[in-house]
Amino acid sequence: MAIAASAMCLFLVAMFVTLLEGLICIVLVVPVFLVAGSLGGLVGGAIHNAKGTNRSTLPALALLPFLFGPIENAMPHQRSVETVTNTIHIGASPEVVFDQLADVRAIKPNELGFSFVHLIGLPKPVEAQMSGTGLGAVRTSRWEKNVWFQEVITMADRPRVLQYRFVVPKGAIPRQALDEHVEINGDYFELVDGGYTLERSADGGTELSLTTRFVNKSRLQIYGNLWGKLVLKDFHGSILGLMKTRSEIASSALPSSALLQHPVKKLASEL
């Protein structure tokens, strides 16, 4: 079993070194490969011990992955809609927090904190900029590696709700920017919609929640859901941390009277 697992690790290292797969893809498949390699080693060892040494047995077993490959490719892609939500407490009023959501300029890497998905190569957000007014306004998010996409506003009620649907124009995701297994609106995952909800807490601060819905189109639904949710939760954590930092800085810069008298307006009349 140890030999099989070691062989799998060497195979994955070779895939990365020869640039056949990116680091993101390697990290995604490591658990599956290690489990499959270990099980394969156990089965192969059991067959070897039961039947003794046979020169034709090992080559026959080695051909099994190639025989099952076409069967897997022939299986239809399944689809499931999944939802991920993260919440953070912010020491600023909902009005102040809401005003930080539309335009998020010049994001510095240190503002995002540590993120596992960014560590393995997922591009970091650079800025988000709102264009237009009211419902139908477009918030354009730009990431590293020239990745960008749009969020079309579907509901805006300051300081309670900001919702949007995702739009990924053709050419917005450079082919080399993301591994195909985590590509936005690629063969495996598709972003549907999302948004922020804000609730005033007892201390006058804000409970800010970020929700994203995505479609899992992979054949391995359970595994795809696991990684899809892990990636989004990690990304949500970075964005919510950024909103917390900027909102609390903005709140501390306001005079007390402004915090108490801040009007509640509709985004439609403000943008």
Please annotate each region the language model reported:
Residues 53-69, 244-271:
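Short, highly charged C-terminal tails/helix-capping segments
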Residues 211-236, 259-264:
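C-terminal/domain-terminus segments
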Residues 5-14, 22, 47, 53-134, ...:
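Hydrophobic ligand-binding cavity/cleft-lining segments
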Residues 2-48:
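Membrane-embedded alpha-helical segments of integral membrane proteins
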Residues 33, 91-92, 189, 226-237:
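Soluble non-cytosolic domains of exported or imported proteins
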Residues 93, 145-146, 158-159, 201-205:
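Short strand-connecting beta-turns/loops that link adjacent beta-strands
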Residues 1-2, 33-37, 59-61, 119-195, ...:
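Glycine-rich portal/gate segments that line the openings of hydrophobic small-molecule binding cavities
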Residues 96-101, 107, 153, 164, ...:
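Hydrophobic pocket/interface hotspot
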